[in-house]
């Protein structure tokens, strides 16, 4: 079965990246419902302080499964909070069909660290 990788990129005003990263780190609790969405294989959030960007990278069973994130209200609410602070999103959020991969992609939907 082919996987789909969804990559969301959020650009933060330069002076706000540390605060934004902390908000994203703390948002893990309010976003735990993502783990219950059908088709999720793995999900992670990250920060690139040098480029003043946050990202969410997720792997799904299908494009339809990945597109659930476009309607997941807790994430939409979080995005509005970032937007109110001047953040901009790469739109439309791309969903990439995997052409090949090395290694295993998770499938339990459980958080990993």
Regions found by a protein language model. Give the residues of each.
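Short S/T/G/P-rich N-terminal loop/turn motif that feeds into the first structured element of a domain
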Residues: 1-54, 61-73, 81-113
